[in-house]
């Protein structure tokens, strides 16, 4: 199986002026405000193939329905886009996800269109709700990935050590600002010894991600974001540009409690 490079960019918040890291809700991660019941997200890719940009599509490339509980966490996600005509591709595509949450555990189970389990993810949380360990099991690929997180609250850093079933290891180090936003990510491969990618993040006046700069060994990519908002301050349109070229537009239809 092709090695999966996992890049975790979970955004984390700070409580008051204390240098303590606090996990964000799924609403926060999606630039949503208020009590959101569900969000239908239509994604249009204008993207690139081998870094060659193609024309704008008039039909959504992907559509997902996300259901939230009253605390702002996912309970369910459903892909509404018709299954791929390629049977092998369709078999590997997630159609539904169910998420259950307790005080110390989050469990996610993903299914394909046949109702087969594609993967299960179980996160163990500390009393503050921070993820300590996460185990992902991919049924079809016979792959298991274990992630262990440690937190340096004084320096606002999170280190994630990742181990694959075949023994391969990776490491992610995330640095935050005083608002709790990730401002730098360092991603290591080759058993955590080789720096594969460095990312930096800047935010707009609403504290939404405005620019991400990714630096690899031989090239770099700058991604910028533009938003449109509703009366609640939720992002109803998110436009993503890669090196100045529009690559993705996400349009949201949001229903509130």
Positions of PLM-derived features:
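Sec-dependent N-terminal signal peptides
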Residues: 6-9
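C-terminal motif of bacterial Sec signal peptides marking the signal peptidase cleavage site
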Residues: 14-16
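Positively charged n-region of N-terminal signal peptides that target proteins for export
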Residues: 1-4, 18
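Buried hydrophobic residues that stabilize the cores of well-folded domains
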Residues: 18-257
